[in-house]
C-alpha cells in the first residue's frame, strides 16, 4: 500500500449539506476499495487562481489515505463523472512528504488541545 494525498475542488453553488454529502461519497469509495483514510481537511471556500467553468471560487477538500494503486483509477473516474467536482489532483507521497504530513498533523492536533 502506498500513501496518497488528494485535493479536490467542489463547485461553490453547493450548500454545506451537499458539500458534505459529496465528500462522504468519495470517502465511501475509498473505504469500499479497502483504503485507510489517514486525514481529512476541509479548507473551505477559497478563490481560484483563474476561473474554471466560469466559477472563481470553490470548496477545497484534502484527503490523505493509504491505498493500492488500482484504487486511484476508480477514485479519479468518479471525480470525472461527478458534476460537483471542478478540479482534482492525486499524488503519491514519498517518505519525506509522508513524514512532513505526519509532523504537520501532530502540530495541528497540539494547537487544538491548547
UniProtKB/Swiss-Prot annotation:
GO terms under cellular component: cytoplasm; ribonucleoprotein complex; ribosome
The keyword rRNA-binding belongs to this UniProt entry's keyword annotation: yes
GO molecular function: small ribosomal subunit rRNA binding; structural constituent of ribosome
One Pfam short name: Ribosomal_S6
InterPro entries in UniProt: Ribosomal_bS6 (IPR000529), Ribosomal_bS6_sf (IPR035980), Ribosomal_S6_plastid/chlpt (IPR020814), Transl_elong_EF1B/ribsomal_bS6 (IPR014717)
SUPFAM superfamilies hit by this protein: Ribosomal protein S6
GO BP term (any one): translation
Source organism, top-level taxon: Bacteria
Alphabetically ordered keywords of this record: Ribonucleoprotein, Ribosomal protein, RNA-binding, rRNA-binding
Database matches in HAMAP family: Ribosomal_bS6
Family according to the record: Belongs to the bacterial ribosomal protein bS6 family.
PANTHER family xrefs: MITOCHONDRIAL 28S RIBOSOMAL PROTEIN S6, SMALL RIBOSOMAL SUBUNIT PROTEIN BS6M
Biological role stated in the UniProt entry: Binds together with bS18 to 16S ribosomal RNA.
Name this protein carries in UniProt: Small ribosomal subunit protein bS6
Native source species: Bacteroides thetaiotaomicron (strain ATCC 29148 / DSM 2079 / JCM 5827 / CCUG 10774 / NCTC 10582 / VPI-5482 / E50)
